[in-house]
């Protein structure tokens, strides 16, 4: 089964998905929506779960949790937690929160090193951040299984 990962923001949501063996994370898209219109994100998640080529293949949602460097919560952390609560009422899959500190900055650095300009970075950074979050999650899961 696959894992679907989200990097949620106020106006964009990066999506990534794992392979069926849960070893590789693949960026899917930067989804743009009206500010704070999270039902649009929920509808997009339902699309991936029910209508896309991944229909019936996802067993868990991974949601990036933007903690501060000292692990305290920010306004954005609270927004993501509230979204997770609403999402749980709309889907039956388990939702896991994954520390996403520095994921967007790391994604921007990778894109800069790749020669992407500002406009190109804007179109790719959130899906790449979701991919990095999912890679961290998968790595942690494999590490826990091997111990």
From Swiss-Prot:
Keyword Nuclease attributed: yes
Enzyme class, first EC level, given as a word: hydrolase
CDD domains for this protein: YqgF (cd16964)
Keywords, in A-Z order: Cytoplasm, Hydrolase, Nuclease, Ribosome biogenesis
Any one biological process term the GO annotation gives: rRNA 5'-end processing
GO cellular-component term (any): cytosol
Location relative to the cell: Cytoplasm
Family annotation (InterPro entries): RNaseH-like_sf, YqgF, YqgF/RNaseH-like_dom, YqgF/RNaseH-like_dom_sf
Domain of life: Bacteria
Single Gene Ontology MF annotation: nuclease activity
EC number(s) per entry: 3.1.-.-
Chief location bin: cytoplasm
Family under the similarity heading: Belongs to the YqgF nuclease family.
Function, in words: Could be a nuclease involved in processing of the 5'-end of pre-16S rRNA.
Protein name per UniProt: Putative pre-16S rRNA nuclease
Native organism: Metamycoplasma arthritidis (strain 158L3-1) (Mycoplasma arthritidis)
């Amino acid at each position: 089964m696959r894992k679907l990962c989200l990097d949620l923001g106020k106006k964009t949501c990066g999506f990534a998905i794992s392979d069926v063996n849960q070893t590789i994370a693949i960026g899917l898209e930067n989804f743009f929506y009206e500010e704070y219109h999270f039902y649009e994100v929920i509808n997009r998640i339902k699309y991936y779960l029910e209508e896309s080529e991944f229909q019936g293949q996802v067993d868990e949602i991974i949601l990036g949790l933007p903690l501060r460097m000292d692990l305290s919560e920010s306004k954005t952390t609270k927004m993501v937690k509230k979204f997770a609560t609403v999402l749980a009422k709309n889907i039956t899959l388990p939702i896991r929160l994954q520390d996403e500190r520095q994921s967007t900055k790391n994604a921007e650095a990778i894109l800069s090193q790749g020669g992407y300009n500002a406009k190109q970075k804007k179109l790719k950074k959130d899906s790449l951040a979701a991919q990095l979050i999912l890679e961290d999650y998968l790595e942690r899961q494999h590490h826990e299984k091997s111990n």
